[in-house]
Amino acid sequence: MTTNYIFVTGGVVSSLGKGIAAASLAAILEARGLNVTIMKLDPYINVDPGTMSPIQHGEVFVTEDGAETDLDLGHYERFIRTKMSRRNNFTTGRIYSDVLRKERRGDYLGATVQVIPHITNAIKERVLEGGEGHDVVLVEIGGTVGDIESLPFLEAIRQMAVEIGREHTLFMHLTLVPYMAASGEVKTKPTQHSVKELLSIGIQPDILICRSDRAVPANERAKIALFCNVPEKAVISLKDVDSIYKIPGLLKSQGLDDYICKRFSLNCPEANLSEWEQVIFEEANPVSEVTIGMVGKYIELPDAYKSVIEALKHGGLKNRVSVNIKLIDSQDVETRGVEILKGLDAILVPGGFGYRGVEGMITTARFARENNIPYLGICLGMQVALIDYARHVANMENANSTEFVPDCKYPVVALITEWRDENGNVEVRSEKSDLGGTMRLGAQQCQLVDDSLVRQLYNAPTIVERHRHRYEVNNMLLKQIEDAGLRVAGRSGDDQLVEIIEVPNHPWFVACQFHPEFTSTPRDGHPLFAGFVKAASEFQKRQAK
């Protein structure tokens, strides 16, 4: 089987939406029956985004196999059925780390290790490895053409086109076509210069995706085609839309998938986008609206919670409810009190690290519990709910997590000291261990308690969800909290760790140690988020009576 590669680059400015465009194209190709995957190559020096600030970089998306990756992989999984893995994302830092390890080991037999050929060869090897077994692989190059950091990646894909053959490789370039209000026209010059930059390093784009706030007129597309040496039918207009789920249809309507299939000599049926049409219909025709407060510590950059925000929207789709998400800084709860939580139909506390804002989250969990407001806690959101219950119901004064107060009297949340690494070996870690790559990561099995709320929601006795955390419920103090009424609704496959808690005699109070947002998709939703939005809607109706 021959694998075909589509290399996706961006020019003029960053944040054009390369990830969404690549994922949308992949969705169309998948709808034509092709086996498709997507890779993201990030030019930064960090080995992975695991230790990067969410306020700078956005969320860290966790794959099934436990890789901490770029948030674009979340977009990929929400658009196509193929699950991402650690093979789908790597960085300059990872490449250099691998090459330097080989150099120290003597693998290069004393050769002078250089960017070309050693770094570029390592990039090519990883791309080929990630593409094995697929009909089409889309490879998104992070950053903007012209950045120094991207040059090794661009050189590597240029070489791949020569080595694999142009009949099995395509270059797709996203570029900005700005509208000038003063003259009342769009301007193509930035696109021409961006393509010129690509040409200077030996890459001739085959497809141009023109990003604009409006449809790019046919005469302007013809002009771009002429001056950029691209067929006119391969110049695609991609205007701003009110829903990203409209983009597959927008690209298909301009024949992009047909052009690619002909170029790769792929004989496959027409794309059936009926599932996406259903998503668009549900999104455009809600029967009601709810307001859900998300109380977090990184809310100045909503991308820090990208998957949670999308999962809430998916929960809305499954209930035909429009979800209005109100982002609330947990530190504001500490300084201004619970007044800012009033008027919400439900409350969600997402994950996070560090002590800043945690007391505000604990106050939030208590407010939801005492006022019968639907509550969903994720990761840290579960831990603060447990701390609240321990303090205010189980009479464990000043209960806390050892992450925040190492010597507290009631450490109801504590560090896991024994881990299994990716090779299955037992490893002992402590608070002094490296931060990078030292968490419970990836898909883990969870057993649900028979008569629990989550057992009803999932309609299954055992589930698999993804984790990203270092701290767990302290089993030594668990009995005292359970005796006070808290219910453990889910445990790890080996029955050792608490995964889900519920508050009995509450309309809807669920908190989980895992991250359900990573497996939510617009077509399928997720049981927890669908149930949570439904509970918010029911709470709203009760309040209106």
From Swiss-Prot:
Catalytic activity: UTP + L-glutamine + ATP + H2O = CTP + L-glutamate + ADP + phosphate + 2 H(+); L-glutamine + H2O = L-glutamate + NH4(+); UTP + NH4(+) + ATP = CTP + ADP + phosphate + 2 H(+)
A Pfam family that the UniProt record links to this protein: GATase
Principal location class: cytoplasm
Keywords: ATP-binding, Cytoplasm, Glutamine amidotransferase, Ligase, Magnesium, Metal-binding, Nucleotide-binding, Pyrimidine biosynthesis
Pathway(s) of this molecule: Pyrimidine metabolism; CTP biosynthesis via de novo pathway; CTP from UDP: step 2/2
Residues holding ATP: 15-20, 72, 239-241
Glutamine amidotransferase type-1 domain segment(s): 291-542
Active site annotation, chain numbering: 379, 515, 517
Enzyme class, first EC level, given as a word: ligase
pH-dependent activity: Optimum pH is 8.7.
Residues noted as binding CTP in the record, renumbered to the chain: 14, 147-149, 187-192, 223
Chain positions recorded as Mg(2+) binding sites: 72, 140
Gene Ontology cellular component annotations, sorted alphabetically: cytoophidium; cytosol; protein-containing complex
Subcellular location: Cytoplasm
GO terms, biological process: 'de novo' CTP biosynthetic process; CTP biosynthetic process; protein homotetramerization; pyrimidine nucleobase biosynthetic process
Positions that bind UTP: 14, 187-192, 223
Region called Amidoligase domain, residue ranges: 2-266
Enzyme Commission (EC) number: 6.3.4.2
Activity regulation field: Allosterically activated by GTP, when glutamine is the substrate; GTP has no effect on the reaction when ammonia is the substrate. The allosteric effector GTP functions by stabilizing the protein conformation that binds the tetrahedral intermediate(s) formed during glutamine hydrolysis. Also activated by magnesium; the enzyme requires more Mg(2+) for full catalytic activity than required simply to complex the nucleotide substrates. Inhibited by the product CTP, via allosteric rather than competitive inhibition. Also inhibited by divalent metal ions such as copper and zinc.
Subunit structure: Homodimer that associates to form homotetramer in the presence of ATP and UTP. The substrate nucleotides ATP and UTP act synergistically to promote oligomerization of CTPS from inactive dimers to active tetramers.
Note: CTPSs have evolved a hybrid strategy for distinguishing between UTP and CTP. The overlapping regions of the product feedback inhibitory and substrate sites recognize a common feature in both compounds, the triphosphate moiety. To differentiate isosteric substrate and product pyrimidine rings, an additional pocket far from the expected kinase/ligase catalytic site, specifically recognizes the cytosine and ribose portions of the product inhibitor.
UniProt cross-references to NCBIfam families, sorted A to Z: PRK05380.1, PyrG
Function in brief: Catalyzes the ATP-dependent amination of UTP to CTP with either L-glutamine or ammonia as the source of nitrogen. Regulates intracellular CTP levels through interactions with the four ribonucleotide triphosphates.
Family, per entry: Belongs to the CTP synthase family.
The protein, known as: CTP synthase
Species of the source: Escherichia coli (strain K12)
Taxonomic classification: Bacteria, Pseudomonadati, Pseudomonadota, Gammaproteobacteria, Enterobacterales
Chain's gene name: pyrG
